[in-house]
Design a protein with these regions (language model features):
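Peripheral, non-AAA+ core regions of ATP-driven protein-machinery
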Residues: 16, 349-358, 364-377, 381-383, ...
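Conserved ASCE/P-loop NTPase catalytic core
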Residues: 1-433, 438-456, 460, 464-482, ...
Length: 827
């Protein structure tokens, strides 16, 4: 007979005396990642490889609360501190193609310097350039040019008037043009009456000569216009010469300050050239022209094109930047080009370009959240393009998606120099590998964070330092004494479901740390003890166990049928785990088996009702294999049996109840009652070995609570797979009940051990002839199967005899003459 488990195997207990501190306040806070050696090595590799093709980006995989973000920030801060600061990034006006602003990269801190230099320089030029036009030399040379062209202009006009008089016309200037008037013989202009009184042939002659005069005037006016243009050109060239002479030294000085920065020098040259070519804004002191409309019109700033838009200022950076983007929308990643509305029209310019995370992280590291990034398909597709092209391009999202949009700026793309780190689940990683062919090419490093680590003395001491770190980071968290640390370590072991492991789900641990500190404060304690941790865990269970308590109430009141006393054949208490968010609990269920003569074999009622999953169906098929090997070596199995989870109305899956179902079948076949004070969990293989399952602690505790609610008898307990013993981390109440003999836990390795414990009857072993003793469970099963076989055989024989009798009677009836056969009139 199987012996129940010893108390010391039901739960790992951490000894507070193994810690040599008074409270965690005496410890150095943990400043490193523990239990994630594999992931740490992957991070070192990914951060250490500098690939010009941007293929060694990192995907950090793992469950929530495993310290992924903390580890990434820790390593990135160390790695970035040893790297040089990236350059500042600026955008400036493109004087050749204004809709394509140019980028400029400068050493860290010099972007703002360049902006300030240009602001001050333009302000100085706005004051100094007008003075160039007020100088005596400029005025004298301008006067000389004006006089030279004025004389030529006067000469041309005099020639025009003289030739007009020779043709018999005089010229009259008006505000709207020039009139030609015919002259009389006396040299006076003809009046309209005098002209009308002339003979027709005389008038025709005047009109002919008038056409010649107008052509003459047109020719001379064109020459005058050319003279005016030449004068304006000379004046402009003089102005350019004067301004260039004035501003060149200051621009040369700027070139000297930015020597070696080719893009800056190009911009300085372009600004100098544009100022010289467009002096009107400076001559008018930058004042807007008077609007021709009766209301004020917005005017463009003529000096904005000489400013510098600093997108990224790395003057205060220590090493390479580390940017964490929690909301990876397209504008947040790639930046945006803002617009403002004037008179109903959206306008923009280079000064309205705003940076994205990629710009701020350029030359360093960008950390993204996978759940957020991959919900935003546009962001992911654009990011892949940026990595492959190795450039950061700001585009209109509507245009990128193929929708029509107003043509706007297309800033020159910036070189892409970023190491990407995406943090997400292993599930997303597998999906990307399967469905996105680019992902594997661009993310060659996977840092896989596990949920557990080995429970060693070193890790237990590190856990104490982790609690010290929690206290230092959270003012509301009190220090833990050794008993409190021990309870937290036990809880960390409990989370893993393995006595040899500690949980790496630090998020879950921190929640209990804060709650335990809260309960300590309510008792006016200056530190957290083991009792406070226990209370925090109990209070959390109380907040979450409403459904669990309701199910126990229904079992206690008899609404749900679960027996915890007595015996019954073909009926076993199975155990399942229900997961309600972050709270899991065990629920006992009655499993019954009904056996009768027939050829239906093993019928799974859950499967027939379409309430059973594939894994559960597999477990039922395994039962058929076990029964066939044990009891069908000499004759086929000739019985029908049905299995059911009683009062189950939802989907059932998993094979953890397959051993329980097998016990129910064996009990029904052997007609041996099973102890109802025992519950069973564990899967079984075709050889009868009981295999480990999940949720063993919740299942045991769930049945214990039901037994406690209905009344503990001292005979109650749970059969678990022997392979699950190392997974036991039962609550202290259950451990105490086992210690006092009120409850029991039995490790089962084979079906034989389990059926013997449940029925109190030996399972039985085959003798030399291959038969089981009649007074054993298997012997009784064989007897029942033989009985059913004989019954089926007799039934089949009777069916054959009845069939033969029916056939004989039919033949005899066919041989007799009928009245119709004797009818002489029948042809």
């Amino acid at each position: 007979m199987v012996k129940e488990l010893e108390v010391n195997k039901l739960r790992y207990t951490c000894d507070p005396s193994s810690f040599e501190f008074k409270t965690t306040a005496d410890l150095e806070p943990l400043d490193q990642i523990i239990g994630q050696e594999r992931a740490i090595e992957a991070l070192k590799l990914g951060l250490g490889i500098k690939d010009v093709k941007n293929r060694y980006n990192i995907y950090v995989a793992g469950g929530p609360g495993t310290g992924k973000m903390s580890a990434v920030e820790h390593f990135l801060s160390r790695s970035s501190a040893d790297e040089p600061r990236p350059p500042d990034l600026c955008y400036v006006h493109n004087f050749d193609t204004p809709y394509t602003p140019k980028y400029i990269e400068l050493p860290a801190g010099r972007g703002c310097e360049l902006r300030t230099d240009f602001e001050q320089h333009i302000q100085r030029l706005k004051r100094e350039i007008p003075k160039a036009f007020e100088s005596d030399e400029f005025k004298a040379r301008s006067k000389k040019i004006n006089e030279k062209h004025g004389e030529k202009r006067t000469t041309l006009l005099e020639q025009m008037e003289q030739k007009s008089r020779e043709l018999g016309f005089t010229i009259q200037r008006t505000p709207i043009g020039i009139n030609t008037l015919p002259l009389s013989d006396s040299g006076e202009p003809l009046s309209q009456e005098e002209y009308d009184g002339l003979p027709e042939d005389k008038r025709d002659e005047i009109r002919t000569r008038q056409g010649e005069v107008q052509s003459l005037i047109q020719e001379h006016l064109q020459e005058v216009a050319h003279l005016d243009e030449a004068r304006e050109t000379e004046i402009k060239e003089l102005a350019k010469e004067a301004v260039l002479f004035m501003i060149k030294p200051s621009f040369d000085q700027m070139r000297g300050r930015y020597e070696g920065l080719d893009r800056v020098i190009e911009f300085i040259d372009a600004v100098q050239k544009d100022i010289v070519e467009n002096l009107d804004a400076f001559r008018g002191n930058g004042q807007a022209k008077k609007s021709p409309f009766p209301f004020p019109m917005p005017q463009a700033d003529p000096f904005k094109q000489y400013t510098v838009n600093v997108l990224v200022d790395n003057s205060k950076a220590d090493g390479a930047p580390v940017v964490v983007e929690q909301n990876a929308t397209y504008p947040n990643l790639f930046g945006a080009i803002e617009r403002r509305v004037q008179m109903g029209v959206a306008i923009t310019d280079f000064s309205m370009i705003k940076p994205g995370s990629l710009h701020r992280a350029n030359g360093g590291y960008l950390v993204l959240n996978a759940n957020n990034l991959f919900r935003l398909g546009l962001s992911w597709e654009a990011l892949k393009i940026a990595i492959k092209r190795r450039e950061i391009r700001i585009e209109d999202p509507m245009q990128m998606m193929g929708y029509s949009a107003t043509e706007g700026l297309r800033p020159e793309p910036v070189p892409f120099r970023i190491k990407l780190v995406i943090i997400g689940s292993s599930y997303i990683y597998e999906l990307l590998h399967h469905y996105d062919e680019d992902f594997a090419k661009l993310f060659n490093v996977k840092a896989d964070f596990g949920t557990e680590m080995e429970r060693t003395a070193e890790h237990e001491q590190a856990m104490a330092r982790f609690l010290a770190a929690c206290c230092s980071q959270e003012p509301s968290v009190l220090p833990f004494d050794p008993s409190g640390v021990a309870k937290m370590i036990e809880y960390a072991t409990e989370l893993t479901g393995d006595q040899t492991k500690l949980s790496c789900e630090f998020g879950s641990l921190v929640s209990i740390v804060k709650e335990a500190a809260y309960w300590a404060r309510t008792e006016n304690s200056d530190h957290v003890t083991g009792e406070h941790v226990t209370r925090a865990l109990n209070e959390r269970d109380f907040r979450h166990d409403r459904i669990d308590a309701k199910i126990r109430e229904m079992i206690t009141r008899g609404t749900i049928f679960v027996d915890t006393e007595g015996e019954s054949a073909g009926q076993v208490n199975g155990l399942a785990v229900l997961q309600m968010g972050d709270y899991a609990f065990g629920k006992p269920s009655r499993i019954t088996a009904s056996v009768h003569a027939g050829k239906g074999g093993l019928i799974d009622i859950e499967r027939e009702a379409k309430l059973g999953g594939k894994t559960h169906t597999k477990g039922i098929m395994i039962l058929k294999g076990f029964l066939g090997e044990r009891f069908a070596q000499e004759r086929p199995l000739s019985f029908a049996a049905s299995l059911a989870f009683e009062q189950s109305y939802s989907m059932i899956d998993g094979d953890s109840a397959s051993s329980t179902e097998l016990y129910a079948i064996l009990s029904a076949l052997a007609d041996l009652p099973i102890r109802q004070g025992l519950a069973v969990t564990g899967s079984v293989n075709q050889k009868g070995h009981v295999q480990p399952i999940g949720g063993v602690n919740q299942k045991i505790e769930g049945f214990y609570r039901v037994c406690k609610a209905k009344g503990l008898t001292g005979d109650q307990g749970v059969l678990i797979p022997a392979a699950n013993v190392e997974n036991l981390m039962l609550c202290e109440e259950v451990v105490e009940a086992v210690e006092t003999g009120q409850f029991h836990v039995y490790p089962i390795a084979t079906i034989e051990e389990g059926i013997e414990l449940l029925t109190g009857v030996s399972a039985g072993e085959r003798d030399d002839e291959g038969s089981y003793p009649e007074d054993t469970v298997f012997g009784r099963v064989v007897s029942r199967l033989e009985q059913i076989h004989e019954t089926m055989k007799a039934s089949a024989k009777n069916d054959d005899e009845d069939a033969k009798k029916d056939k004989t009677e039919n033949n005899e009836n066919e041989g007799k003459d009928t009245p119709e056969d004797d009818d002489p009139n029948k042809s």
